[in-house]
Amino acid sequence: GHSAYIISTILARHGFSKSFHIFDSFEGGLSDKTSEDVSDYARQTKEEAEFEKNWFSSTINDLKKALIGFDFIEIYKGWIPDRFPEVESKKFAFVHVDVDLYQPTLDSLKFFYPRLLPGGVIVVDDYGYSVFPGAKRAVDEFLRGTDCSVFYETPMGSCFIIK
């Protein structure tokens, strides 16, 4: 919800009039890690995994409350990529992927990049974070088969993919 609030605030200040689509399970989600998501030094106890899942979850009502007043937001509750068909016919100028894990990151890139307008930007929030190695693996795998105009890794761990 923090990223959605920051992005919404910036968009509102600049007179944004398009739709801002937010996809979230509202169930945490770090419990569905695969071998692609585990770093060698980030092994967890069951208690640590449960804490992590709860740390990254919020309710849809909490999000709606935080984003009240931003009438351009559309929220899709569900798992990635299950809800993507609802926006299959749309084009996107900006996509912010903050899903931490390999498979939903890869699914997001495969779905949104072909629908990205020329010059459009995809930001992958967790690309450079060692605790989320799956995000980097997904981006690197995706880029091997994609001709993007620009790829830029920020010093803060995100990356930008520009079509």
Task: Tell what function each PLM region has.
Residues 1-163:
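S-adenosylmethionine/decaboxylated-SAM
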